[in-house]
Amino acid sequence: MMRQKLFDKIYGCLLGVAAGDAMGMPSSLLPADEIQRLFPEGIDSFLPAPPGHMIHDQMVAGEITDDTQQTLLLADLFLETGSFTAEGVARKLIAWADRINAFDGLYLGPSSMRALKLIKDGADISKTGLIGDTNGASMRISPVGLAHPGDLEAVVTDTAEVCKPTHNTNIAIAGAAGVASFIATALACDNLEECVDAYFYGVKAGMQRGGKWTGASIQHRTEWALKLVRSGKTEKDIWSNLYNYIGTGVATSEAVPTSLALVVMYAGDPWQVIRAAANIGGDCDTIGAIAGSMAGAFAGADGFPEHVAPKIEEVNHLGLEQYANRFVEKLVLADD
Ligand SMILES: [Mg+2]
């Protein structure tokens, strides 16, 4: 694989997480009609949180949230240790949540909050994630895709391991494995249909892992969402149908199908995808991060407008380019 191209795709994936997260930050967890009231022109650039936002009050334009922070924790784990272990994930998440006081308030999602508190109290991590079915696993999973270009079996195995402490349900693993499989395929492929096929492979394989839990089928909801985006309806009608019928909430079986649908709707153009996520309503920052991770891996960092990466770095100092370089080094070394 061309080293420069691999770098561009990995960088694009991480940039998609951060830019999607930051663009959806001001509208995060707001209903669609409330977003239209607060932002009558729509959100088509990085904006500050509206005053009094229930989670992001006072945050500035371009600022990222937990989605990007947790993604980089998983990237750190892989870059430091060369593998993903459930213990390593739990250790990283607990240290981070303690550092930023996330065990108080709404910053930490419901599955992670519940499970990490139990783990801190000494619970067995093979038990703590058995009812975790929300989208936190999918929002932070992209490093698993980045670690295994083209190797979907390894993606599914590592996804189940990463989900174990907090999201050890078939539903959460299916969503996360779908996203990570899309990314792992996009690193080595410029055909969107193949990446979508990989997503469905990951969803189906993920459903065989973890504890059994009930929820709407991610596979069937995604198929329905894809029919919707190919129906010829107007952009606004498709957004409203995704919001009302597929859903854009914190459930994995809402957020992940809608994210994949947005990627297909805009043929993998990451800026259009994350703009749609910021305006669609519901869990906008997380849908932006998930859809952005897939579109960014598909299109590469070159697929974003030029101002995006400098703005994200100026506000957040994440060093995403360095992260991408370190991934490439690790993957090229492992290949030799
Ligand atoms: Mg967030």
Per-segment meaning from a language model:
Residues 1-336:
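Structured, active/binding-site neighborhoods that engage oxygen-rich ligands
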